[in-house]
């Protein structure tokens, strides 16, 4: 029988839910009777089948998301090289990584066993060889009163059962699903998670929230404990308010992944009190949404401009207008902009 091409086999296995791997590792381990393979680059046995396996995925999980990068670097536009689970290892893209001070980094003491930290604990890598479940990690700082903003950059191909960015309380068990492929963030009332498929998860429910994101995408998160809102950004443009009524609650920034050899990096983490200065900068950005430099042309002392850029640069640079919906054939349709406008009352 003629051998089917690799790309054809991958699509066939995804659509038929066959549990096989397209990597060469499958050949080396094919003699092991009790193991199977799936599209996350995972070894899978009877206790590591994905929950909700009967539910259709919004995009084929074996195929990495492309075309959603913040920049046009070659290393971001080239997804996989050689096989579904061998990432293109070109020069690391540093676009969007201007910050030098970070309010928090990833916590080496509160993470799943299948994680590895690097870059001064700002970059987390998941499932270094293969995956047998879901790995997660949280930040070093519990976020309480004030304004909190951070950005996570997808530094590897994005694929698999799920890769998520979100928040959760101290009650979230990060290692609970280390033998289960699932969307960990948002499975209960203690966490919210935005999936790379564009689905928002909370209390076990899924809501179509945005277009998908992939390698090179920058996902921003704004936790406003004054107004009690959680807002997500994609490539520094607002995509919507995900949660409200979060006043007087404390959360940790969290990410999770089921994909083998996947990674994410904190490129910005900052905090501010909800002061008159913050509210003024926020209002200025609303009044000048299309300006590259919100303070440009304003009659302010140079020293004050420098202080504001240093302390509240993220407020002055973010686009608060949600993007217009685009007819994406392979992704969930975003909700109407009118229902997701980032405004304060």
Swiss-Prot record:
Sequence intervals crossing the membrane: none
B30.2/SPRY domain segment(s): 84-273
Cross-referenced InterPro entries: B30.2/SPRY, B30.2/SPRY_sf, ConA-like_dom_sf, FBXO45-Fsn/SPSB_families, SOCS_box, SPRY_dom, SPRY_SPSB3
Cellular location(s): Nucleus
Signal peptide interval: none
GO BP: any one term: proteasome-mediated ubiquitin-dependent protein catabolic process
Assigned GO CC terms: Cul5-RING ubiquitin ligase complex; nucleus; SCF ubiquitin ligase complex
Sequence segments annotated as region (Disordered): 38-58, 320-345
Family to which the UniProt record says this protein belongs: Belongs to the SPSB family.
Function, in words: Substrate-recognition component of a cullin-5-RING E3 ubiquitin-protein ligase complex (ECS complex, also named CRL5 complex), which mediates the ubiquitination and subsequent proteasomal degradation of target proteins, such as CGAS and SNAI1. The ECS(SPSB3) complex catalyzes 'Lys-48'-linked ubiquitination of nuclear CGAS in cycling cells, leading to its degradation. Recognizes and binds nucleosome-bound CGAS: ubiquitination and degradation of nuclear CGAS during G1 and G2 phases is required to promote low intranuclear CGAS abundance before the next mitotic cycle.
Swiss-Prot/TrEMBL domain comment: The SOCS box domain mediates the interaction with the Elongin BC complex, an adapter module in different E3 ubiquitin ligase complexes.
Protein name: SPRY domain-containing SOCS box protein 3
Organism: Bos taurus
């Amino acid at each position: 029988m003629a051998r089917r091409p690799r790309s054809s086999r991958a699509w066939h296995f995804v659509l038929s839910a066959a549990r096989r791997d397209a990597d060469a590792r499958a050949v080396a381990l094919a003699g092991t009777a009790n193991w199977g393979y799936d599209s996350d680059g995972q070894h899978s046995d009877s206790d590591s089948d994905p929950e909700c396996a009967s539910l259709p995925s919004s995009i084929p999980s074996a195929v990495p998301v492309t075309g959603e990068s913040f920049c046009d670097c070659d290393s971001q536009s080239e997804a996989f090289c050689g096989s579904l689970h061998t990432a293109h290892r070109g020069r690391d893209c540093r676009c969007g990584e201007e910050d030098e001070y970070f309010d928090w980094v990833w916590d080496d003491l509160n993470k799943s066993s299948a994680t590895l930290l690097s870059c001064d604990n700002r970059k987390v890598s998941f499932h270094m060889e293969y995956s047998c479940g879901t790995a997660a990690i949280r930040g070093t700082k519990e976020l309480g009163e004030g304004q909190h903003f951070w950005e996570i950059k997808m530094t590897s191909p994005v694929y698999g059962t799920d890769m998520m960015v979100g928040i959760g309380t101290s009650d979230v068990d990060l290692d609970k699903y280390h033998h289960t492929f699932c969307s960990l963030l948002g499975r209960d009332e203690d966490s919210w998670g935005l999936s790379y498929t564009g689905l928002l998860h909370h209390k076990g429910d899924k809501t179509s929230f945005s277009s998908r994101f992939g390698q090179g995408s920058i996902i921003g998160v704004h936790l406003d404990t004054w107004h009690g809102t959680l807002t997500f950004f994609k490539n520094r443009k607002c995509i919507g308010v995900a949660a409200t009524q979060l006043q007087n609650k404390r959360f940790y920034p969290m990410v999770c992944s089921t994909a083998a050899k996947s990674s994410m990096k904190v490129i910005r983490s900052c905090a501010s009190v909800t002061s008159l200065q913050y509210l003024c900068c926020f209002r200025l950005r609303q009044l000048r949404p299309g300006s590259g430099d919100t303070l440009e042309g304003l009659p302010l002392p140079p020293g004050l401009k420098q202080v504001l850029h240093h302390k509240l640069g993220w407020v002055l640079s973010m686009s608060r207008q949600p993007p217009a919906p685009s007819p994406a054939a392979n992704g969930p349709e975003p909700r109407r902009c009118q229902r997701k406008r980032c405004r304060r009352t």
